[in-house]
Amino acid sequence: MSYLSIAKHYDDCFKKHGDNNLGVDWPKYEDTLIRHEIMFQLLQGDENVSLLDFGCGLGHFYEFLKSHNHHNFTNYSGLDINESFYQTCKQKFPFLNFYHTDILVNDNIPNFDYIVCNGTFTEKRELSQNEMMEFFTSVLKKLWAKTNKGIAFNVMSKLVDWERDDLFHVSIDELGWFLKNNLSRNFVIRNDYKLYEYTVYVYKK
C-alpha cells in the first residue's frame, strides 16, 4: 500500500466537508486550536524566522498565526502533496508561497528555520505499521536536512487504553532511539495537552 492513499483520503474529506476542520479530518475544531498553539511553541519566542508548514492542508495554521498576530514575525510557506489543498491555499493566500510536491520524490525546496508537521503522521489509513514507519522516518530525514533550527511533528500515543487501526500510534522509546541515531539528541516530547497524541520538537542545537 502506498502512502499516496493517505493523500487521497484527505482529498475525499475536503470534497465532502469543504474548507474546515472536518475537511482535513480533524473531528473537533477546538482541538485543532490546541494543536496549532503547541506547534507554534516550537519557535520558543524566536522572531523573524522562516517557517514551513509541511502538509499544510487548507492553510489553517496560517489562519491561526494571523488571528493571534504571530504571522508578523514568521515568514510562512506551506507545502502539500495534495493538489486540491495546494490550489485552495494559492487562491486563499495569493501573497504567500506554497509548494506542491512529494518530498520523497523531489526535495528541491529551500531550507527553512523551522518546519512543522501537524497531522501529517497521525493517520496511516490502510498502511501497515511498518509501511507507515518507513514513510514517517524517510520524510523526517528529508525534513531534517531542510531545517536550520528545528522541526515539530505529532503522532498518536501508545499510552492509551486502546488503539485505532487507521491511526499511527508510535512508542516514545522507539521514536526516541530513532531521533538520537538519525536526527538529534536535542528533542522535547510534549505529552501535556490532554489529547491522545504527543508532539515532538527536535532542535539542531
Model features per residue range: what roles?
Residues 1-20:
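N-terminal, positively charged/glycine-rich alpha-helical extensions of SAM-dependent methyltransferases
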Residues 163-205:
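Class I S-adenosyl-L-methionine
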Residues 107-114:
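A short acidic, Gly/Pro-enriched loop at the edge of an enzyme's catalytic core
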Residues 57:
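Conserved glycine-rich SAM-binding loop
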Residues 147-155:
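Conserved beta-strand signature within the Rossmann-like core of class I S-adenosyl-L-methionine
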Residues 52, 60-97:
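Class I SAM-dependent methyltransferase SAM/SAH-binding core
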Residues 30-47, 64:
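Conserved alpha-helix/loop element of class I SAM-dependent methyltransferases that forms part
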Residues 114-133:
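A short SAM/SAH-binding and catalytic strip from SAM-dependent methyltransferases
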